[in-house]
Structures are given as C-alpha cells and as structure tokens.
Amino acid sequence: MASTASEIIAFMVSISGWVLVSSTLPTDYWKVSTIDGTVITTATYWANLWKACVTDSTGVSNCKDFPSMLALDGYIQACRGLMIAAVSLGFFGSIFALFGMKCTKVGGSDKAKAKIACLAGIVFILSGLCSMTGCSLYANKITTEFFDPLFVEQKYELGAALFIGWAGASLCIIGGVIFCFSISDNNKTPRYAYNGATSVMSSRTKYHGGEDFKTTNPSKQFDKNAYV
C-alpha cells in the first residue's frame, strides 16, 4: 500500500514538473531588459529561444525571428536541443510510469511493473537534468554579459521562463528519485515462520500411538480368555 501511494505521489510530482518544463518553450521572457524614462517604462526588450522582441510604452511589440539555425549562437542551439530533449524524455517517462504503476491494470506482473517504474524514474531524472542544464546554460550567458564591463550591447536579466524551467526540472528529478526508490519497497516481501504443521503432526502421532496401545490390550486379553 505504501509503495502504491509513493508511486502516485511520484507520478503527480513528475507530471507537474514535465508540464512546467514544456511550458517554458513557448514562454516569451527567457531574458528581459527595460529602458525606464522619468515617468513610465519607454521600452521593454525580451527574447526567448525563437525570437527577440521589443515592446514600447503603448504595448505594441515588434519581433524578429532568429535566422537560420546554422547562424545562431552556440548556446541557443544547445538550449533548444536540451529543452526539446527534456520534453521528449518527460513524455516517454509518463508513458512508462503509467505501465509501471501498481494501480494500473497494464504492464504484466508486479515484478515487471516495478522494473518499468524504475525505468520511468530514470527517464524523468534525465529529463530534469536536461532542463536544468539548458536553463543554467542560458542563465550563465546572461549573467556573464551583464557583469562584463567590456560588453557594450543591450544587457539583459533573467526572465520568468528560466525560473519555471528550474522548478520543473527539480520536480522531475524528485519524482524520478521516488520512482527509483519504489522498486526497493516492492522487493521487501514479508517472511513468516510457520511451525503449526510440526505441532499438529506431533499431536497426531501421540494420539494414534495411544490409540494403538489401547486397541492392542483388549486383543491380548481376548486371546487369553479364549484359551481358558
């Protein structure tokens, strides 16, 4: 029962993390920078993995999609690959989890389901690590440019998508670890010492022995009386 409850908790945590990681891909604010006037914000610069935009004080945005993939910076290409890999691994991890959980009717025996659940945990951990690496790589680029005194272009700050990605990656890793530990709970089967058969047999043996003794005595007496 405890193993089933832990698997349900792990599934909910992992799925929540996977949803958060998936939501970072279309999120706009991976990095953001604002130009403030004396009264209002005159412009907001922001970018994600696919485009860079500027929004003026009236709320009108002008966006420019990134050029060909071969012309992109290396860190953007790496972040794209890592985040897409994280989403894909989370999808397969959720399928493995559905087959490996005890509360489902698919997946075979309990032993086979425990192995599938452990595999789902490993896949979720890999998904979380990919997301964590991608967000950290992007954040490292932002902070390096921000604190570089020789960098004269527009400087950005960390956007909301990075924090969402880190949170989702943490949930995926936590859920995957719980899935991996659930296989140890499945292997702990209770052992019982059964000594009832020995006591029953010994009592039966004594009973039959006494019965034989009683039945043999009358036969001997009958024989003696017959000859007399």
Curated annotation (Swiss-Prot):
Residues 22-80, 137-160 are extracellular. Pfam families: PMP22_Claudin. One of its GO terms (cellular component) is bicellular tight junction. It comes from the Eukaryota. It catalyses: Na(+)(in) = Na(+)(out); Li(+)(in) = Li(+)(out); K(+)(in) = K(+)(out); Rb(+)(in) = Rb(+)(out). It is found in: Cell junction, Tight junction; Cell membrane. Gene3D superfamilies: 1.20.140.150. The chain crosses the membrane at residues 1-21, 81-101, 116-136, 161-181. This is Claudin-10. GO terms for biological process: monoatomic ion transport; regulation of monoatomic ion transport. Forms paracellular channels: polymerizes in tight junction strands with cation- and anion-selective channels through the strands, conveying epithelial permeability in a process known as paracellular tight junction permeability. In sweat glands and in the thick ascending limb (TAL) of Henle's loop in kidney, it controls paracellular sodium permeability which is essential for proper sweat production and renal function. In renal proximal tubules, it conveys selective chloride over hydrogencarbonate anion permeability which is required for renal chloride reabsorption and salt homeostasis. One of its GO terms (molecular function) is structural molecule activity. Belongs to the claudin family. The gene is CLDN10. The fourth transmembrane region (161-181) is necessary for integration into tight junctions. Residues 102-115, 182-228 are cytoplasmic. Its main location: other. It is a multi-pass membrane protein. Keywords: Cell junction, Cell membrane, Ion transport, Membrane, Tight junction, Transmembrane, Transmembrane helix, Transport. Can form homodimers both in trans (interaction between CLDN10 molecules in opposing membranes) and in cis (interaction between CLDN10 molecules within one membrane). Interacts with CLDN19.
